[in-house]
Amino acid sequence: MKPFQILLFSALILTASTCTANSYVYVTNQGANTVSVIDTQNDKVIALINVGKGPVGVAVSPAQSRVYISNVEGQSISIIDSNTNLVIDELVTGGSPVGLAIAPDEKTLYVADWYDNHILAINIQNKQSQRFLSGGESPAGLIVSPDGKMLYVANRDSNDIAIISTESLQITSRVPVGKHPYGLDMSTDGNFLYVVNVLSNSVSIVDTKDGHSYTIPVGDHPYCVSASPDGTLLYVSNTQGDSISAIDLKTKKVIATIATGSYPEGIAYENDAHKIYVANWGDNSVSVIDASTNKLISNISTGIQSRAFGQFMMQAQH
């Protein structure tokens, strides 16, 4: 093979490994110890992956083609190669790992230990390099600011959000929210944090510049939240309402309540086709909703007790 051909071939391989034509959904099935992989182009399950015991949280790393799964009962993190959909490593954490988040540079994995009340920061390139921080009571949802400088932690039993410097791993401030904050999302510019308050039946919108917040009532026992990429709409799963609430962020009002499967938990917005994916714990499925019409498109059978807590959508890379 000629040098030019070798270089061209190598470039094609590199492009194929770093660009994903379709978006993929990674759904943890806590009762089956598996992860269902859904291709959003045809909304079909294309793989079923055996992971650790009691999988709950998900974080995706597109550039490195990795998916991280927290196994709350197995006290571990399963690491999946998204190119092959095979588990390539199992990282023992101890405790009870639940929430996960990846830094924007994809160099650090953050893990919320639900029962031991601490956050674990793991160097992805050297997984034995780990730092610990006590952030609050029963930490659940995690998310990192787009600039990578701040980690936000929903402390369920402290009823607050801990804001942590990722450089020092020190808490810089706390923001009180509703009762039992759990799922988190953030606007693409990092200016607003969205917090689900389970026992308050509400979502808090926190201005990350000054800490001021605004609360919007939603359905019964909300759990997780996902914002549209243009920052105009917010979607909240209501576990005991078997529905999601669609919120207009300009008017700060619920504009639609959309029926889903039983006990919806994890929720994610697919950017290209503008579809919403909701994991239903109660009937082992994922509901797919058209964001342009707020209508249910289909329900996809997955596995026992589907949760998909966190950022479980591997968005298409163009």
Where are these predicted regions, by residue range?
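Predominantly soluble domains enriched in secretory-pathway, periplasmic, or organellar proteins
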Residues: 5, 11-318
